[in-house]
From Swiss-Prot:
It comes from Bos taurus (Bovine). Accessory subunit of the mitochondrial membrane respiratory chain NADH dehydrogenase (Complex I), that is believed not to be involved in catalysis but required for the complex assembly. Complex I functions in the transfer of electrons from NADH to the respiratory chain. The immediate electron acceptor for the enzyme is believed to be ubiquinone. PANTHER family: NADH DEHYDROGENASE [UBIQUINONE] 1 SUBUNIT C2-RELATED, NADH-UBIQUINONE OXIDOREDUCTASE SUBUNIT B14.5B. The keyword Electron transport applies. The keyword Amino-acid biosynthesis does not apply. Signal peptide: none annotated. Complex I is composed of 45 different subunits. Interacts with TMEM242. Belongs to the complex I NDUFC2 subunit family. GO terms for cellular component: mitochondrial inner membrane; mitochondrion; respiratory chain complex I. The modification N-acetylmethionine is found at M1. It is a single-pass membrane protein. This is NADH dehydrogenase [ubiquinone] 1 subunit C2.
Amino acid sequence: MMTGRQGRATFQFLPDEARSLPPPKLTDPRLAFVGFLGYCSGLIDNAIRRRPVLLAGLHRQLLYITSFVFVGYYLLKRQDYMYAVRDHDMFSYIKSHPEDFPEKDKKTYGEVFEEFHPVR
């Protein structure tokens, strides 16, 4: 039976190692987008229940926005953690297998670009 990566706890949304990562910024555009989705879901809820779409239930729309941003914040935190785990595994593999990843010789910009001749 496949158990996945060693040391990985199953069915755990945010492990304790995720606390060492910096939290997502509250000004992240992805959070604003998720909040906008919450606002739109409040509008759709009003439209389905045949209420005035923009004016009815402003408190409900605010509740949708805050709950969507709250859930989105933890989803972003999980996404950042998963990317950090992937990067850690990838860099440790590169470090332990240097023969598969040879150092490339560094070129200067003069070697990369062609010589410039202005046309007048």
